[in-house]
From Swiss-Prot:
It catalyses: Transfers an alpha-D-xylosyl residue from UDP-D-xylose to a glucose residue in xyloglucan, forming an alpha-(1->6)-D-xylosyl-D-glucose linkage. GO terms for biological process: xyloglucan metabolic process. It comes from Arabidopsis thaliana. This is Xyloglucan 6-xylosyltransferase 4. Glycans are attached at residues 76, 110, 142, 174, 490. Belongs to the glycosyltransferase 34 family. It comes from the Eukaryota. The keyword Membrane applies. Residues 61-513 are lumenal. It is a single-pass type II membrane protein. The lineage of its organism: Eukaryota, Viridiplantae, Streptophyta, Embryophyta, Tracheophyta.
Amino acid sequence: MFQDGSRSSGSGRGLSTTAVSNGGWRTRGFLRGWQIQNTLFNNIKFMILCCFVTILILLGTIRVGNLGSSNADSVNQSFIKETIPILAEIPSDSHSTDLAEPPKADVSPNATYTLEPRIAEIPSDVHSTDLVELPKADISPNATYTLGPRIAEIPSDSHLTDLLEPPKADISPNATYTLGPKITNWDSQRKVWLNQNPEFPNIVNGKARILLLTGSSPGPCDKPIGNYYLLKAVKNKIDYCRLHGIEIVYNMANLDEELSGYWTKLPMIRTLMLSHPEVEWIWWMDSDALFTDILFEIPLPRYENHNLVIHGYPDLLFNQKSWVALNTGIFLLRNCQWSLDLLDAWAPMGPKGKIRDETGKILTAYLKGRPAFEADDQSALIYLLLSQKEKWIEKVYVENQYYLHGFWEGLVDRYEEMIEKYHPGLGDERWPFVTHFVGCKPCGSYADYAVDRCFKSMERAFNFADNQVLKLYGFSHRGLLSPKIKRIRNETVSPLESVDKFDIRRMHMETKP
């Protein structure tokens, strides 16, 4: 029932709605038209009212203006009457604009007009804008303009950072370069000093005092990893020197600007000789060389009658005159007069610039296999020893019985074989004393070998040597390419037994031939 009633009610309501809707649209249309007309009429009335108000305002303004004009005219007439007597007293040639200026003193017609008391003559060709500037001294048209007193001539190719450096003395191209004042009696001077200073002996515990000298450039490496491996190389050298009672100096200063690159070692060696007379041997070692036989010791008694010990091959030196017959990356030089004389004869071939370039041409022509490039310290030493053989060669020991210099490429891949077959203390090809990474240039931006191979090989060499140091403490690297370590023996209640057995300082193994 509820549903049927709903439908019926809905039908009736729908019919009535339709009827109302038709009548409603007519009514609404009429009302909307009336509203539009009413709104339009109101807008017209508002516009008329605005125009009327505007006219009233304009009329009021005109009247006020007329009143103002009348008042202004009366005031002007009064002012003119008062001014006429005054104007009659003013000369006829005076300008009206001068009335506002204060009275001036009489000016002589022959006097020169000035704004202030006379300071300096102003040239006739000076621009008006220049009058506010201080007077300038006369400038000769042929003079050279400068910002201040002349300090020094600056070459056109100078870098901006070089301007902060003090001026350098000119070096004559014909002058012979020297490392310093010529010393002729160093042996006697040193002997006297040693006698006067017994607390600094040149022989300690029966061994000649050695100072290991190494170093690198003053600035950082081109690549951060280069600094990392330089640090490892320094650590390796410190370990060896600590275990063998050798002093070490790491130099990063360029002591002589003329001797750069390979040549920086010469002034350093000479300086240390003269500053440490207690040192018997200066041992130079390149930064890219590593000790890989920590147990091996330099057989100094073998060199009792020699002053220079350097790795090389006599046949390559004397018969073939090869430029790689010797290697100046690692050598020992006795602190004596002979060595100072050798340095004095060696250094003049190294000053950078024209001397080094011209000497390089001579060395390339003289030595077998040498490429054409500027003079290097190694070629220069070989040339010196061959060209002045009678003077030098008697005191030179060309060492090849052990690896004072061991070329890395034929060694680093054999370390596992060496560990399996041999033992440290041999120093030769069975267990190389030094592994030298010639051509890798870990600190430079370029190298003669693949960078990745060089750094991996240096890592192997370092860990190979470091295992010999860690053995005393009961540790070893997990692998030759791993920086991580592992324990190789347990701790005991009798640790001194391990010290006596593994301490390199107490081990005296003879080097086998």
